[in-house]
Amino acid sequence: MKPLLPSRASDAGVPGLACLFVAAVLALPAHGQPVVDAVIPFADAHVHLNDPAMQRDLMQRWGATHAVVFWGGRSSNESVLDAARSQPELIPFASISPERTAYRPAWERDDPALLHQLDALLASGAFRGIGEIAAAHFPAAGFAETDFSPLGPMMTGIMELARKYRLPVMVHVESTRLQELAAMLLRFPDVPVIWAHGGYTPLFLARRMLQQHPNLYYELSARTWPRHPRSPDYTILRDGVEVWPEWLQLIEQMPGRFLVGTDASHRSPASEAMKFASVQDFLRQIRPPVREQVARGNLLRLVGLAP
């Protein structure tokens, strides 16, 4: 896929890598011996940007050279874009997710005015993707359940805009809407779709969906946490640390189809550090020949920052 937008001089992640060097020096023990585990540079596919300053600190500490950022409980499309303008390592996505109380009524009445609003945002050329769109999302802390069909008028309109502007779309769709998601992917084979958390699907469904839909990308945020607060089987870890060998095998068989993410939301420094540390722990378990694709290459290519 050709780059979607012109690249910038800072897109190569040089500032982020410089921060990694500084972090590595600061991490040296007092006696000057190097730490055992080096920080692995990665591009974070999933951040709810509520606190740009905290996000910057976390990225510098944990090796994130880039991050896809979008709405949070305390942010909007406008504030996300403002942050990205001052922090070029942030990759802004525009969203009209029904999980937001401001947008939900429009989804319930299939209001095209909301799609026109998204069209205007994308026409600015400032956003590198669409999402996160929580079309079907089980209840979570602070957010009511959403259950809109991926084949409905709103998602269809979003996908048509993604096609128009040649942008990827990040969707949160649970396994209860798997059939409609598959049909949507077939209807828009030219639109890259990032599946947030991979829909928390088990291994065999992940494999099937990836084999059947070449435009689908399986995003692993919250799947690498030591423990998921909603369900213990949501993670891909067998003991809170080690990735199941079968998952590693699938990822290494299809390295061009997986993305890493933190699902950061800046609730507290401690909770966010856990999320970033889990990405580092996961990446250390992937064989080096394919690690770079999963860690950074796939995402940067999708958003037009790499060939």
Regions inferred by a protein language model and the residue ranges of each:
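Mid-to-C-terminal alpha-helical segments outside catalytic/metal-binding sites
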Residues: L4, R8, V14, L28, ...
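Hydrophobic faces of well-ordered beta-strands that scaffold small-molecule active sites
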Residues: A43-V47, A67-V69, P92-S95, G129-G131, ...
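N-terminal carbohydrate-binding/catalytic regions of secreted carbohydrate-active enzymes
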Residues: V47-Q87
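Active-site beta-loop-alpha junctions enriched in small/polar residues
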Residues: H48, G72-G73, S95-T101, I133-A136, ...
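A general structural detector for well-ordered alpha-helical segments in enzyme core domains, enriched
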Residues: Q55-L58, S79-A83, L114-L121, M154-I158, ...
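Active-site gating/metal-coordination segments in enzymes
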Residues: R74-P168, W225
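Catalytic pocket-lining loop regions of alpha/beta-barrel enzymes
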Residues: E145-L259
